[in-house]
Amino acid sequence: MPELPEVEVVRRGLETILKDQPILEKVELMRKDLREPIPAKKISTLVGQPLTSIERRAKYLLLWTPKGAMLSHLGMTGTWRVAVPGDERLHDHIYLHFSGDLRLAYRDPRRFGCFDFVQDPLKHPKLADLGPEPLEAEFNGPLLWEKLRGKDVALKVALMDQKVVVGVGNIYASEALFAAGIKPTLPARKLSLERASLLVGEIKKILSQSIKAGGSSISDFAQASGESGYFQTSFRVYGRDKEPCVTCGQQVKSKVLGGRNTFWCSRCQK
C-alpha cells in the first residue's frame, strides 16, 4: 500500500501537471464504487470550478476547488496519470476532464482506493480524527512519547495507528525502528522520552529521503508521470528476511505484528 512518501510524490506530480489551475469540465465515473460508493452527485457540484490546490493529509489526496474538494485514497494499487486520447486502460475507473484538453485517469485494479467529496476536512469522517503529520514541526519526541503512554501494543503496531501519527506504514515503521536501534516488539508504553525523540528524528529523515527518491515502487506504485520510485533499493531491513543485517551481519528476522510482516535485527535493535 502506498504510504506517506508515495502519496506525497503523487501530490507533487499532480501539482506540477495542474499548476495552471484548469477548470474541471467533467467527472466521468466508469463504475459507481471503489472500496465504497462514490458520491457522484456531490462531486458533480465541483464541475465548472477551477482546481486551486492539491493537498495531502495522511495518505489522502485533496484536489481543492472553491466549492470543495475531491478526496482520493490510492488503496493498494491506485495510480493517477495523464491520459491522452486513446489511452484508456483496463481498470481505469475515473476520468477527470479539465480545460486545455487535459484528462487525468485513476486506475485501481484491486479497487481498495476511495473517491469522495470533502467540504470541511475537520468534519469529514475520514479526516477528522487523524493524528499529526510526521514531517511537521509539531510532531516531536515529547508528543510521540505522550501518545504512547499506556499503550500495551507493540511499538511498531502503535506507529501504524493513524491516531498516533499519520502515514507511517509498514515499510517506514520497520525502517525507522531499525535506524533508531529499537526493536519493533517493545511495548509502546515502555519507550523512553529520549528514545522517542531519536525515533521521531529517524522517521522524519527516512520519509524525507523516500520522497526525494520518488517513493518505493513495490507492487503497482508509480508516480503521476508514470515513473517508478527507487527508495526500495535503500531498504535496510524491510523485505530482507533471513538476509544478513547490513550493519552487523546477523540474520534479519521477520514476524507478523498487527497483521503485517515486520523485519528487524535482534542484535542491532534493543
From Swiss-Prot:
Keywords: DNA damage, DNA repair, DNA-binding, Glycosidase, Hydrolase, Lyase, Metal-binding, Multifunctional enzyme, Zinc, Zinc-finger. A zinc finger (FPG-type) spans 236-270. It catalyses: Hydrolysis of DNA containing ring-opened 7-methylguanine residues, releasing 2,6-diamino-4-hydroxy-5-(N-methyl)formamidopyrimidine; 2'-deoxyribonucleotide-(2'-deoxyribose 5'-phosphate)-2'-deoxyribonucleotide-DNA = a 3'-end 2'-deoxyribonucleotide-(2,3-dehydro-2,3-deoxyribose 5'-phosphate)-DNA + a 5'-end 5'-phospho-2'-deoxyribonucleoside-DNA + H(+). SMART domains: Fapy_DNA_glyco (SM00898), H2TH (SM01232). Pfam families: Fapy_DNA_glyco (PF01149), H2TH (PF06831), zf-FPG_IleRS (PF06827). InterPro entries: DNA_glyclase/AP_lyase_DNA-bd, DNA_glyclase_Znf_dom_DNA_BS, Formamido-pyr_DNA_Glyclase, FPG_cat, MutM-like_N-ter, Ribosomal_uS13-like_H2TH, Znf_DNA_glyclase/AP_lyase, Znf_FPG/IleRS. DNA binds at residues 91, 110, 151. Its EC number is 3.2.2.23, 4.2.99.18. The keyword DNA damage applies. NCBIfam families: fpg, PRK01103.1. Involved in base excision repair of DNA damaged by oxidation or by mutagenic agents. Acts as a DNA glycosylase that recognizes and removes damaged bases. Has a preference for oxidized purines, such as 7,8-dihydro-8-oxoguanine (8-oxoG). Has AP (apurinic/apyrimidinic) lyase activity and introduces nicks in the DNA strand. Cleaves the DNA backbone by beta-delta elimination to generate a single-strand break at the site of the removed base with both 3'- and 5'-phosphates. HAMAP family: Fapy_DNA_glycosyl. Monomer. Belongs to the FPG family. This is Formamidopyrimidine-DNA glycosylase.
